């Protein structure tokens, strides 16, 4: 593995972390080639997480929009309610293989934290989750859920007290406890081999979707659309389609209150190339290279960077990156709930918002797959607040 996607990616880390990364890459390479390991991974995806997830034809939505056929890849139906578990099961099996007794993770919306705590409970591992104090306030339900699962939740009070700071704390902890601790990163970010490893554990989404659409339609889709924070759900569904040049890949970032307001998280649209969390990629930073505060109604998308492979897909023109505002995401959230009886995560609602803009301009012969990366239970409070409803 080269660890680079064009000029992006790499391993911008202190010496102390280098050896752990080399060991991790070696073990991951071996595990990937090990039939027993992959079989065990697939066993847990199937029996524990409930895969394969359906590829659902959203007939009502399609008819109402009056254009392209819209299919939803139902990652919201996974155990713990999002795509996160695909990656966590893989990494925790790897931790077990490496004889690590303790796992740590960062979390923003709390979904990755919940998934990590869930798998740690099942495999009997000690688990500590780092979470920004701001996010803890926004996601109190997920915080309690992690504690219920036996994890220790450590509030991060530095910087903007959000995801970026939680990552920094997790890295600090990892460096200190490198012998017994495995760091479970939640997205296709961080130093090599993480972006590749997380993508490989998430590609099951795209592998299934490809097989399912061929079964249902006898051909590949015209568009595959997914939301992008760090970008693991998007990378997971994009990757198996990369060689299929006729399939357009579209990543949707969070435009927050608008791309010109400074209150957004659209690193591809407004960012520049820099280094954060051990990788070179597009970042929202000022002239001095300081990371700028980011904002989105959806806690899972407010990351100031993006996975390095996405940066490469953008630069090589293989994927296109667009954005949706809070307002558009909220409208899509309500719309899907009332049209299909599916309450999507606010993250996924960003992808949906763009698909709903695109579909009416296409013909009935066109096919769109939207990655419905998670369910919206965790967002009901947020949406109620926006609508002025007291719960």
UniProtKB/Swiss-Prot annotation:
Entry-annotated residues carrying N6-(pyridoxal phosphate)lysine: 84
Cofactor(s) listed in the protein's UniProt record: pyridoxal 5'-phosphate
PROSITE patterns: TRP_SYNTHASE_BETA
Tagged with keyword Cell membrane: no
Reactions this protein catalyses: (1S,2R)-1-C-(indol-3-yl)glycerol 3-phosphate + L-serine = D-glyceraldehyde 3-phosphate + L-tryptophan + H2O
Amino-acid biosynthesis recorded as keyword: yes
Listed pathway(s): Amino-acid biosynthesis; L-tryptophan biosynthesis; L-tryptophan from chorismate: step 5/5
SUPFAM superfamilies hit by this protein: Tryptophan synthase beta subunit-like PLP-dependent enzymes
Matching Pfam families: PALP
MF term (GO), any: tryptophan synthase activity
GO cellular component, as recorded: cytoplasm
Assembly notes: Tetramer of two alpha and two beta chains.
Family: Belongs to the TrpB family.
Entry-linked HAMAP family: Trp_synth_beta (MF_00133)
PANTHER family: TRYPTOPHAN SYNTHASE, TRYPTOPHAN SYNTHASE-RELATED
Function: The beta subunit is responsible for the synthesis of L-tryptophan from indole and L-serine.
Protein name per Swiss-Prot or TrEMBL: Tryptophan synthase beta chain
Lineage, highest ranks first: Bacteria, Bacillati, Bacillota, Clostridia, Thermoanaerobacterales
């Amino acid at each position: 593995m080269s660890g680079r996607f064009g000029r992006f990616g790499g391993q911008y880390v202190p010496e102390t972390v280098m050896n752990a990364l080399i060991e991790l890459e070696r073990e991951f390479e071996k595990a990937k080639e090990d039939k027993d390991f992959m079989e065990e991974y697939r066993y847990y995806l199937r029996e524990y997480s409930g895969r394969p997830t359906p590829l659902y034809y959203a007939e009502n939505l399609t008819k109402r929009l009056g254009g392209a056929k819209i299919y939803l890849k139902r990652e919201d139906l996974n155990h713990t309610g999002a795509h996160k578990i695909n990656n966590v099961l893989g990494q925790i099996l790897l931790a077990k293989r490496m004889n690590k007794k303790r796992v740590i993770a960062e979390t923003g919306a709390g979904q990755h934290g919940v998934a990590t705590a869930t798998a740690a409970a099942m495999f009997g591992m000690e688990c500590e989750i780092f979470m920004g104090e701001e996010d803890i306030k926004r996601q109190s339900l997920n915080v309690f859920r992690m504690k219920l699962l036996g994890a220790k939740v450590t509030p991060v009070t530095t910087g903007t007290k959000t995801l970026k700071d939680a990552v920094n704390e997790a890295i600090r902890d990892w460096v200190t406890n490198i012998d017994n601790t495995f760091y479970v990163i939640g997205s296709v970010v961080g130093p090599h081999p993480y972006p590749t490893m997380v993508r490989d554990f998430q590609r099951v989404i795209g592998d299934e979707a490809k097989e399912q659409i061929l079964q249902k339609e006898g051909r590949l889709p015209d568009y595959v659309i997914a939301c992008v924070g760090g970008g693991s759900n998007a990378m997971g569904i994009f990757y198996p389609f990369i060689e299929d040049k006729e399939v357009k890949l579209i990543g949707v970032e969070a435009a927050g209150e608008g791309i010109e307001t400074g209150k957004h998280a659209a690193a591809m649209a407004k960012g520049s190339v820099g280094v954060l969390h051990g990788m070179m990629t597009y970042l929202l930073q000022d002239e001095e290279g300081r990371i700028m505060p980011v904002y989105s109604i959806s806690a899972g998308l407010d990351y100031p960077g993006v996975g390095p492979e996405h940066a490469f897909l953008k630069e090589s023109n293989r994927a296109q990156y667009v954005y949706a505002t809070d307002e558009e995401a909220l409208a899509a959230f309500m719309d899907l709930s009332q049209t299909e009886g599916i309450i999507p995560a606010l993250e996924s609602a960003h992808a949906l918002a763009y698909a709903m803009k695109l579909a009416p301009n296409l013909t009935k012969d066109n096919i769109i797959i939207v990655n419905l990366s998670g369910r919206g239970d965790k967002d009901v409070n947020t949406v109620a607040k926006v609508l002025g409803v007291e719960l």
